[in-house]
Curated annotation (Swiss-Prot):
The gene is MT-CYB. Heme 1 (or BL or b562) is low-potential and absorbs at about 562 nm, and heme 2 (or BH or b566) is high-potential and absorbs at about 566 nm. It comes from Lepilemur ankaranensis (Ankarana sportive lemur). Its cofactor is heme b. GO terms for biological process: mitochondrial electron transport, ubiquinol to cytochrome c. It is found in: Mitochondrion inner membrane. Belongs to the cytochrome b family. Heme b b566 binds at residues 97, 196. This is Cytochrome b. Binds 2 heme b groups non-covalently. It is a multi-pass membrane protein.
Length: 379
């Protein structure tokens, strides 16, 4: 008798995606981050649902409702800090996941890669809107500054900003629509994740060698389910340690002050995971130029597959490309640091140099290194 998981219409899909999925035998722990991102999304949806039960999307009561969640709701503080720090874990896993894709040449799986970039944009939009909801000082001014960037778009910019605000400034209408969008987007992200996996399972996973592994595959369960479970335990350990011992480590103290449109904080800055893009935005003195650079800093990932002329898929056997990849990582860490600093010398110059290096590495230096390596290998 054939197993029910192989016959039942619904269980068959789950079986082919999570149990009997043919997987390369040599994928490393860096391939764990896909499942960890799924876990992060689940944690965010569950904690977010409980927070939404007690939160009120109104400018007069939003801040108080968050305080009420932390003080009066059973384990409300735990749920709130798990949600806030869960977002940080989400982005940490996202950045490693994208970095692994760049290092091992997973961008050659075009459909999977492009859906992944759309997912990245969606998660960034969701996180930004979530940061506005507590209605603290940094929430209000972050929303004002970032949405106001759209006014740089010629002709329609000002109208677009007022349309997003629902008025002539960030107000109750803005908060209400941000809450509605913040609630619905994770479910849209879940649907995109399904499409991401659908495209991935069409081609099969890449592996550290970049070699075809069709002749040598192993089932996903039990080998990679146990491996993923270990990664999940480590993620939960890190999340719990942060949420329970250092809940405000990654937050901004200004957000414990209720939003005041008459008082601007000395340094307006987003959460740590947006600082690299914020530094690129600030490094260009022109408003429209800054906005374009900000969008291109992520959108550039879409053209990476067309900029890489390498004959070997992964960087495993390409020392020059490896060296440049780690320079790129160091550059992004520098940009993250600069994004959190005030706009004054020497930070302005460092930010401009780091931003230039980021785009030069992506567009010119790394593709050139690929050509040099091809030449050295006589390919």
């Amino acid at each position: 008798m054939t197993n029910i998981r192989k016959k039942h219409p619904l269980l068959k899909i789950i079986n082919n995606s999570l149990i009997d999925l043919p997987t390369p035998p040599n994928i490393s722990s860096l391939w764990n981050f896909g499942s960890l991102l799924g876990a992060c999304l689940t944690i965010q949806i569950i904690t977010g649902l409980f927070l939404a039960m007690h939160y009120t999307a109104d400018t007069t009561t939003a801040f108080s409702s968050v305080a009420h969640i932390c003080r009066d709701v059973n384990y409300g503080w735990t749920i709130r800090y798990l949600h806030a720090n869960g977002a940080s874990m989400f982005f940490l896993c996202l950045f490693i996941h994208v970095g692994r894709g760049l290092y091992y040449g997973s961008f050659t799986l075009l459909e999977t890669w492009n859906v992944g970039i759309i997912l990245l944009f969606s998660v960034m939009a969701t996180a930004f809107m979530g940061y506005v909801l507590p209605w603290g000082q940094m929430s209000f001014w972050g929303a004002t500054v970032i949405t106001n960037l759209l006014s740089a778009i010629p002709y329609v910019g000002t109208d677009l900003v007022e349309w997003i605000w629902g008025g002539f400034s960030v107000s109750k209408a803005t908060l209400t629509r941000f809450f509605a969008l913040h609630f619905i987007l994770p479910f849209i992200i879940s649907a995109l994740v399904m499409i991401h996996l659908l495209f991935l399972h069409e081609t099969g996973s890449n592996n550290p060698l970049g070699m075809p592994s069709n002749s040598d595959k192993i089932p996903f369960h039990p080998y990679y389910t146990t491996k993923d479970f270990l990664g999940l335990l480590l993620l939960i350990l890190l999340l719990m340690t942060t949420a329970l011992f250092y809940p405000d480590l990654l937050g901004d103290p200004d957000n414990y002050t209720p939003a005041n449109p008459l008082n601007t904080p000395p340094h307006i800055k987003p959460e740590w995971y947006f600082l690299f893009a914020y530094a690129i935005l600030r490094s260009i003195p022109n408003k429209l130029g800054g906005v374009l650079a900000l969008i291109l800093s992520i959108l550039i990932l879409m053209i990476i597959p067309f900029l890489q002329p390498n004959k070997q898929q992964t960087m495993t056997f390409r020392p020059l490309s490896q060296f440049l990849f780690w320079i790129l990582v160091a550059d992004l860490l520098t940009l993250t640091w600069i994004g959190g600093q005030p706009v004054e010398d020497p930070f302005i110059n460092i930010g401009q140099m780091a931003s230039m290096l980021y785009f030069f590495l992506m567009i010119f230096i790394m593709p050139t290194s690929c050509l040099i390596e091809n030449k050295m290998l006589k390919w």
